[in-house]
Amino acid sequence: MAIIFNPNKKIFTLQTAHTTYQMQVDRLGYLLHLYYGAKSTCDMDYVLTYADRGFSGNPYAAGMNRTYSLDTLPQEYPTLGTGDFRNIALDIKNEQGTESVELLYKSYEIRDGKYALKGLPAVWASDDEAQTLEIVLGDDIAGVEVHLLYGVLEGCDVITRSVLIKNTGSGNITIEKAHAACLDMVYGDYDVIRFYGKHAMERNLERTHLGHGTLSFGSRRGTSSHQYNPAVILAQRDTTENAGDCYGMLFVYSGNFSCEAEKDQINQTRLLMGLSDELFSYPLAAGETFTVPEVIMSYSADGFSQLSHQYHTCISEHVCRSRFAHEVRPVLINSWEAAYFDFTGDTIVDLAKEAASLGIDMVVMDDGWFGKRDDDNSSLGDWFVNEKKLGGTLSELIDRVHAQGVKFGIWIEPEMVNEDSNLYREHPDWAIQIPGKLPVRSRNQLILDFSRKEVRDNIFDQICAVFDQGKIDYVKWDMNRSMADVYAGNLAYDYVLGVYDFMERLVTRYPDILLEGCSGGGGRFDAGMLYYSPQIWCSDNTDAINRTRIQYGTSFFYPVSSMGAHVSAVPNHQTGRVTSLKTRGITAMAGTFGYELNPALLSDEEKEEIREQIKTFKKYEMLINEGTYWRLTSPFEDEVAAWMSVSRTKDRALVSVVRLYAEANAAACYVKLKGLESDAVYIEENTGRQYTGAALMNAGIPLPFAVKEYEAYQFSFIRLDEAKKLYDEIKKVCGNLKLNEADTADSASDNRIVISIYGGSGSGKTTIAAALQQYFLNDNTACYVLTGDNYPHRIPMRNDEERLNVYNESGEDGLRGYLGTPKEIDFDRINKELSEFKTGKDIIEIKHMGREDGDISYDETDFTGIKVLILEWTHGGSEYLKGVDIPVFLESSPEETKARRIKRGRDENAASPFICRVVELEQEKLDLQGKNARIVVGKDGKVYEQ
């Protein structure tokens, strides 16, 4: 069990895979904090010390014991008015103006699963992934009951905390301060790491030693803000990326927040995170309950990298709910920097044509398509299509864009209103303003009062009327100002809940729309937003060099897959800096990847480079988004910015490096890698050079000497393992083929061979195929890798549904007759492509299948000069597959396949009984097909010919 209660000592122990959190109800009924750190099975009540300290008062219940003081004891949830003069988590005022709540223990409950918060985003998990502890504290005199909620996600090494505050009295109370989490540390010398910034330069890392007193930061802007992110790290002074103790707190909230770190009179440390108490005074009538948003806590004994990995996993697996969270996402181009407000429908279609020719998947029509909006002074609130500007209906424009073979996206800013709008003229009271005072303008716009349901309903209906006009694939939700005219103490909180309500309704109604958050870039980049949108525009600053810092700071808590990052034009529109297209591309690949430029202004050479960039990104997209992200250097301290992604099975790695400045007669620069298998051998794809993992991590790789400023490099590594032995065996088998000779009309067929690599799901087919390709290329033999995943009749989600339908209708025999047969697989198509290759055809239409309905294309591919085609596919040994010269079977068991699928982390239901049975049935067929293999790679890694 993740949560254990010792009834004799009244100690609560929360255990994750590598951490322990403990607290105790003491003899007076106070809930004291004992320990948070590396995993332990010991009761930690011995850490409490008691001393008589002057001017630190004693609860009356302590009698004559002057050593017992809430001013010095570590508390779980400290309150005002109890003799604790440090910063407190909760302040409640009654009708007489008294601010004193003394919380004593009442009860607890442990239950499976993760608690949910009504109307608020929160970490979610299945019953077997999490447990909940609910501790009830109360003050019967004050009429207040507090429910402390703890969610323990053992596998992620995170603990979540939230608080419910109930008015159990007969009168009204007012909440003046409410934090979700308090962490008291009885000893230690700490640094505080926060992520400060400004518009277009967000989340810069700042590390400050915590001296005596309070270090605090937060937001009173109505959003989490560009200025400070709602995240903090408390670290021992010697903690580095790879070693040392550090504690993280991440607030799952998109509004005003506060973080306070205090070192007290006896060198104890207190860390608090929750709602800002500025512009906050929340009335609570008798019987009402208030919910404090959630904090995600995590601890690492192995430095900041491990802490980041824990947060990345938690957010990817247990915060983001979108079906796009683990899917391949479209490479998009946004019209903003290409056209700003100056566009027509033809402009967007022309952009779509250019995009299609470059291999871009989607065009996004940004601000300016609605009302009479040709600048930023009007029409926010009037969400009807400007058909005159677009030259037709939105439906017609969407169809024209889709006809180019690309998806369509659109921009909205639903929370805002211009005074020059029909909505404002009809409902001026819907804009937030203090009665009797003129409002504060920002960007010539006001904020709609989303705390009011009628306001939300009006805008929601308008937006839906637009979205229902055609197949919209993507929406960018923007928010371009801070809140100033706070007319009531409950407004800021209720406003954010209104935004969440709107977003929940939107994603529920349109689950197939990819939603991207934005607030002038990264002004609302937080876990609360990621609950609704799997990605957020990281910053309005697209300068590649500035972005290395912005994305570096963002990566401490948020995964790469959440960071909107694009290649933009040069000179950069924000900084005026000129960087190469290569540098801009490599930097943008550390995010969702897309473009913010006008392709019509590009040279033919630049367009070709973009095509290659997109191919490169798509090749590594799943590695980047699903792999483990490592920071290799700090762009704040080092001469290069370097980072890498490593597959979860540690068989592939992509390293990216950007030089931040050039220096005459510069010293050699080396970058040490991380996260590899020490004893494994890796080959670098571009050079063919081989290294051990230990060498790459301990000695590093030398960078080329800089020729000019801001150069960038990428290095791709593949673990060899059995691939080299397999290659040698393949060369023996096909040794009589003259693969290095040019084709002639008579020899083309004889000189081309097809190799299939087949085995259980997750058995390493992709990695081995990539390594084999590299070996062939090193021997000057052109080679192409074809994935069989493109050849089912249905996209993956629909195929999974069909498998289940077949099983429900026809049982296991029916399922066995479906899996890997022409009922499931388009063998006619793949056999046609293989036949055309074998007979010497140079231009072949290759099928490509995405993960969305209708996402199927047939792309002309040039096979001129290619001698070897490697097909990596579970069904590469099927009796229905024709034209394979050398079938290679990778032995595995269902248990191994299941373990690899879970480790890979790509399949949500990898451990479900049905999927496990599918794997077993597939393995039965594979074992039979293995007998027909020319070469077998055994479970022990040995390679032999049959």
Residue ranges and their predicted role:
Residues Y784, H793-E852:
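Conserved nucleotide-sensing/catalytic segment adjacent to the nucleotide-binding pocket
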Residues F324-D461, Y474:
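Aromatic-lined carbohydrate-binding/catalytic grooves of carbohydrate-active enzymes
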Residues K389-T393, R425-K582, T592-L597, L601:
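Active-site neighborhood of glycoside hydrolase catalytic domains
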Residues R906-Q946:
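Small-molecule kinase domains that catalyze NTP-dependent phosphoryl transfer to phosphate-bearing small molecules
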Residues F5, K10-T13, A17, Y21, ...:
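Polysaccharide-binding surfaces and accessory modules of carbohydrate-active proteins
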Residues I856-R904:
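ATP-dependent NMP and nucleoside kinases share a basic, alpha-helical "lid"
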Residues E241, S634-E677:
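Carbohydrate-binding surface patches
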Residues G693-E722:
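C-terminal beta-strand-rich structural cap/linker in extracellular carbohydrate-active enzymes
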